[in-house]
């Protein structure tokens, strides 16, 4: 598999395709738009959400204010399909293991356009409070996917654009350096791909109890999911 070099892969593309996949699992389609890749430090352009025939049409989108321009730099590399596939498989495994807990979380998030960003920031801050590892990065993607699905279920489709932007910003600003220092997404594929070691070869913490803390306004940590770099 080709390596991305010093710039890494396009985090925006990884986020957009992951969200598209999670929404498609529930019968929704998402057009992420035609904006170019956002390099680390820059925010992406939001996309447009639509539903399949028979679904309630998405309300019109209000775009967030444009972010400050980022300094010019090398463009990130296109993302190999195997990266998307491995991340999807890891997220699906995570979701299956905690299916009931995620269902309860979805029903209790009480997302609104006014609370969504605070919910996102609180969970993500606590998720990475004790450091970064690949498991927590997968949990980050899966939590973002849950927020997007719940937003559409509650007829707040424009929030999907914002969640995608927040995820990309966080990856670019806070996780990109760790990812590159630990071999990039290529290392994730090599460590956790189909022919490599199982994803779940360690003890898991109780996600249900930790999510319950978040839902009453306390901090949340998703624990040592994967538990390794």
Curated annotation (Swiss-Prot):
Keyword tags: Apoptosis, Autophagy, Cytoplasm, Endoplasmic reticulum, Membrane, Mitochondrion, Mitochondrion outer membrane, Nucleus, Phosphoprotein, Transmembrane, Transmembrane helix, Ubl conjugation
Biased composition (Pro residues): 62-81
Gene Ontology MF annotations: channel activity
Chain span(s) of sequence motif BH3: 83-97
Motif (BH4) on chain: 10-30
PTM info: Phosphorylation/dephosphorylation on Ser-63 regulates anti-apoptotic activity. Growth factor-stimulated phosphorylation on Ser-63 by PKC is required for the anti-apoptosis activity and occurs during the G2/M phase of the cell cycle. In the absence of growth factors, BCL2 appears to be phosphorylated by other protein kinases such as ERKs and stress-activated kinases. Phosphorylated by MAPK8/JNK1 at Thr-62, Ser-63 and Ser-77, which stimulates starvation-induced autophagy. Dephosphorylated by protein phosphatase 2A (PP2A).
Top-level taxon in the UniProt lineage: Eukaryota
GO terms for cellular component: endoplasmic reticulum membrane; membrane; mitochondrial outer membrane; mitochondrion; nuclear membrane
CDD domains reported in the protein's UniProt record: Bcl-2_like (cd06845)
Modified residues (Phosphoserine): 63, 77
Membrane topology, as annotated: Single-pass membrane protein
Residues bearing PTM Phosphothreonine: 62
InterPro entries attached to this UniProt entry: Apop_reg_Bcl2 (IPR013278), Bcl-2-like_sf (IPR036834), Bcl-2_BH1-3 (IPR046371), Bcl-2_fam (IPR026298), Bcl2-like (IPR002475), Bcl2/BclX (IPR004725), Bcl2_BH1_motif_CS (IPR020717), Bcl2_BH2_motif_CS (IPR020726)
PANTHER family the UniProt entry points to: APOPTOSIS REGULATOR BCL-2 (PTHR11256:SF11), BCL-2 RELATED (PTHR11256)
Record text on subunit structure and interactions: Forms homodimers, and heterodimers with BAX, BAD, BAK and Bcl-X(L). Heterodimerization with BAX requires intact BH1 and BH2 motifs, and is necessary for anti-apoptotic activity. Component of the complex, at least composed of LRPPRC, BECN1 and BCL2; the interactions prevent BECN1 from forming an autophagy-inducing complex with PIK3C3. Interacts with EI24. Also interacts with APAF1, BBC3, BCL2L1, BNIPL, MRPL41 and TP53BP2. Binding to FKBP8 seems to target BCL2 to the mitochondria and probably interferes with the binding of BCL2 to its targets. Interacts with BAG1 in an ATP-dependent manner.
Family: Belongs to the Bcl-2 family.
NCBIfam families, A to Z: bcl-2
Protein known as: Apoptosis regulator Bcl-2
Top-level taxonomy: Eukaryota, Metazoa, Chordata, Craniata, Vertebrata
